[in-house]
Every structure is written in structure tokens, then in C-alpha cells.
């Protein structure tokens, strides 16, 4: 992002390395305990070579520079988003050996290479969310030569049904269909069976009435048109998310307004796609903290942090994972975990792409060639409209 916070704001980091160290250690202590940091506690833990008076003087300068704020109850200091940014930028990813072993064991739950690539990515996001105990989202391109393998109909009420269309690569499309009249449940099941049999080129149920068959053909064409519309017109990445309820265990998000702001940002497809694409060709994690998110969200300060990292097939980025959390995240551990995770995922995806000869396409909302692309994509789709003679 063009206007990310410049660390030159911390004037003392150039003049005196000690004040920089005090800031880093105060932030580290706050991340460890979650409580305002006093000069006495900081001296006892990480700054034994400095007097309490010197630490207080440094605290005062850091307050002036906007890196710390005073807690009016205890008198201790709390890091601001500038402090968390400085901490994230000046600490390499770090995991204890036992943490690495635990994460590697958890990563064995990732699926092996397969053709069901979207489902595998969704499973991977569940594993990552479980490891970090944080909400996770990821962006995904569309994979070519995908095949529709199933259609399901689920009744909502007397005249509306949801159709669920699933593909070989794990994509799922849903929409609502309107029935011309109320149908018995067993009739809807027979129509669903007709759609599935037609899709798989199998004979239809002998119990299917002509009226049910006619309705089935109309519904089939409606499903196909809606699917092809979404399949061909691809203006932004597909976005998947999980683990939103994990935010509730963090003190920051027990405030309803803060929780609503964080979730509103995470749920906004446009904002998240923009954020995930910002550093798509950077192989290391990137943190967006507090006010750094404001340019994407608008005037609202979301008081949270999002950490992103792209995932690769060989040397080609396919999309990115994003992690949402409070600003006081353990950045070193989160960065280290994301690096281990994407390294393992890269191996799996590379094997899948080469074994099954997969290809993909990205959104092209402004590409003039896109206007010619739908016809080509429609011809290559595995699902077709019924011939006119079958509808007569």
C-alpha cells in the first residue's frame, strides 16, 4: 500500500537504539501479558540495565511520537497500532521447536494432492484456523476444465427450492428457483433424480410423470443458464472464510462495536479481495494493522489486524490467505505458522497441478478480451442447455 506507516516516525530509533529496544520490549511484554506495561515491570523483565526513571523518560517520548498511550487507571503504557507495526517489522518470524513440531503434526491433516482442489483449499483453511485459533479467509481463481457432477434440490417452502450444483474440483454454486405450483415432496425428489440422471447421461426414473419431466427440463435449463452466467462472468476472485466465532474469545472483540467493525471488514468481498491482492507476489506474510486498514474500509478505524500471505503452485501465486485478529497478535508466531503452512500447501498444489494437468484463470473485469471469452467458456463447459426439441 502506498501510504503504509513509515517507521521514520520513530525519530529515536535512529538517535538512540535504547529507546527502540524499550519500545520493542514494552510491546513484547504487553503481548505476553495483555496488561499495561509499567517502568518497574519492564526493568525487572527485559531492561535491567536501565533505571526506572530512564524508562519513564523513554515512555514519555514514545507517547509523544504516538507509539504508546497511557492507561489512566494503572499508569502503565499500552502500545498503539504504530507500536505493533514497528514490532511486526523488527521481529523475524519465530517459533519454538515444540511449536514447530506441533504445527507440522497438524499439517499432516492437509489433504494429499487431488483433483478436488477447491475442497482441499477449504480443508486447508480449516486446519490453519484451528492452528491459529483465528478467522481465516482465502481467495481462489477459477479452475479450467471443471465438470459439474451433481445437482440437488432442497425445498424452502411450497414454491421455492434451492438448487445446489457441485463440480469435480469442489466448487459449489447455489441459487433459489421458483416453482410454478406446489409439489409433493416425493415429486421434487423424482425431479431431482431426473436432473441428476440427465447430467450423468443415465435413463430417467420410470415413475416420473410427463408433467414432472417437463418441469424438470425447464428447471434444468434455468440451472444451466445461471451456472454459465456465473462461470463465464468472473469479475473477482472466489472468496471463502471460516472461524469467525473464534474472535469472541479475544478481549478486544467483546466490545460489540469493535466486533461489528472487524466482521464488516472481513465480510466485505471487495475490501478483502483488494487486501489479499496487494502483495500477491510477496512470498512472506504482510501485516495490516489498525489505521493501515482505514484506506480500504473508509473512515472507520477497524481496531484490528489482518495478516496475508500468498499461496503458490510452483512459482505461480494462485491466491492468498488472510487472518483476522486483534492488533495485539503474537506476530512472530503467526508469521512463522503462515510460512510453514504455505510451504506445505505449495508442495501439495504443485503435485496436483502437474499430475492432473490443471489450469486456471483470474478475474478480468477491465480486460476487453473478456467480452469475447463467455462464448469460448460456454462451449468448453461440461454442462449444456437442453436442445430445443427436448423442451417441446
Swiss-Prot record:
It comes from the Bacteria. The keyword Transcription regulation applies. Changing residue 213 to E: In strain: E/UW-5/Cx. Changing residue 320 to T: In strain: E/UW-5/Cx. Pfam families: HrcA. One of its GO terms (biological process) is negative regulation of DNA-templated transcription. Keywords: Repressor, Stress response, Transcription, Transcription regulation. GO terms for molecular function: DNA binding. Belongs to the HrcA family. NCBIfam families: hrcA (TIGR00331). This is Heat-inducible transcription repressor HrcA. The lineage of its organism: Bacteria, Pseudomonadati, Chlamydiota, Chlamydiia, Chlamydiales.
